[in-house]
Amino acid sequence: MPPSDTQSPAANNAHEFSVSEISFALKKTVEETFGHVRVRGEITGYRGPHSSGHCYFGLKDDKARMDAVIWKGNFGKLRFKPEEGMEVIATGKLTTYPGSSKYQIVIDHLEPAGVGALMALLEERRKKLAAEGLFAAERKRALPFLPEVIGVVTSPTGAVIRDILHRLQDRFPRHVIVWPVRVQGETSAAEVAAAIRGFNAMEKGGKTPRPDLLIIARGGGSIEDLWSFNEEIVVRAAAESAIPLISAIGHETDTTLIDFASDRRAPTPTAAAEMAVPVRAELLADVRDKGSRLIRCEARAIESYRTQLGGLARGLPKLQDLVALPRQRFDTAADRLGRALIRAAEVKRARLSRVEGRLSDRPIRLRIANERKGLPQLLQRLTRAETRRVADLARSLDGSTKLLESYSYHGVLKRGYAVVRDETGKPIRAGAGQTAGARIEIEFAEDRLDAVVAPGGTVAPRKAPPKKPGGGQGSLL
């Protein structure tokens, strides 16, 4: 049989909904039925906050999955940073999103599903950073014995900063610079890391002195409260710090990852201040004690040397005994030397007498005569060489003179030209720009002429100075 076009009475009596109507009806039913709920699940699809500041991800278990959203205002209040795969307990309102007909939970509060989950995440992160070498012992730096400037990264309010400042004042007052940060909350980790890097970026000798030592401090709290100091950004900043760093997070039983990256870990903020500086009174007492011991040691050493010197002096022979034998030897040698000199002179005189008769100046005279015969020839050669040299110099001088005359402007003047100079002696290249009444000098080949620029650009000869009375010869100057 063909299908019938008729509908059942029940279908004809059913209310007709639009898509929007049924979607909003379901939304209302879900919200009124469930209201606020607590859901335990594993975070999936987490990519951090959206550009709007809201955070979208999913919650799942081994059988189902649901969408979740944290609005921007609530996300900033979280005490820890959500991560992919973390098991959490979400508290919020169950609702639907009509645009896609999906239900979701709008989270007001998020917490780890037990301390065990956070500890597992912490251990996994510790192993990862340790494998990178951030916790290696060779990276640790020694703390300065007495830092001039100490930088403290902590909350500006509360007991922690007061305890540190009070302890430093008691032990050894130092210049302290406090970089205020939030020590828990979503922005805490970024602020702490920025403070560490900010201190390291300061220049030595700048307006604000660069610290010689850093203290990162926070009071006690739960693992969630201290979680900012387990974030990678903080641990890496501490490991990269060029300034030695002391971590003092929580109480002695609390351990955070920054403790592994720091150069020293203090169980409390007060203990960090004690590590930072010695006790001034103890140093002064130690200096006085060592000074007294040094003086006593010097006195004992001087007395010991004096005793040894006295013993050595008593063992020395008398001066007269030391020089008596050498003096006797000297006298004997002096007598022998005088006699030896006389005998040597007599021997030399006798030898000279024997050879005196054999001495003759004939060989020397013959050599002088032979050398004298060659003098005229040498003189002629010298004369010819000097004559040639003088002739060469004369030719060179004549050539240089002609070349100099060819470059000299006097040759141009001889062809009828003249050189015009101003009062300072500088040549004038054009008449334009010369003012009337200006004095100029015109140089010809044989003489010079002083002139004055007349109005209109002509040159008028300058009047000669009046002659002196008496008719005598005037001054050439």
UniProtKB/Swiss-Prot annotation:
GO terms for molecular function: exodeoxyribonuclease VII activity; nucleic acid binding. Its main location: cytoplasm. GO terms for cellular component: cytoplasm; exodeoxyribonuclease VII complex. It comes from Parvibaculum lavamentivorans (strain DS-1 / DSM 13023 / NCIMB 13966). Bidirectionally degrades single-stranded DNA into large acid-insoluble oligonucleotides, which are then degraded further into small acid-soluble oligonucleotides. This is Exodeoxyribonuclease 7 large subunit. Heterooligomer composed of large and small subunits. It comes from the Bacteria. The gene is xseA. InterPro entries: Exonuc_VII_L, Exonuc_VII_lsu_C, OB-fold_nuc-bd_dom. Its EC number is 3.1.11.6. The keyword Hydrolase applies. Belongs to the XseA family. It catalyses: Exonucleolytic cleavage in either 5'- to 3'- or 3'- to 5'-direction to yield nucleoside 5'-phosphates. Keywords: Cytoplasm, Exonuclease, Hydrolase, Nuclease.
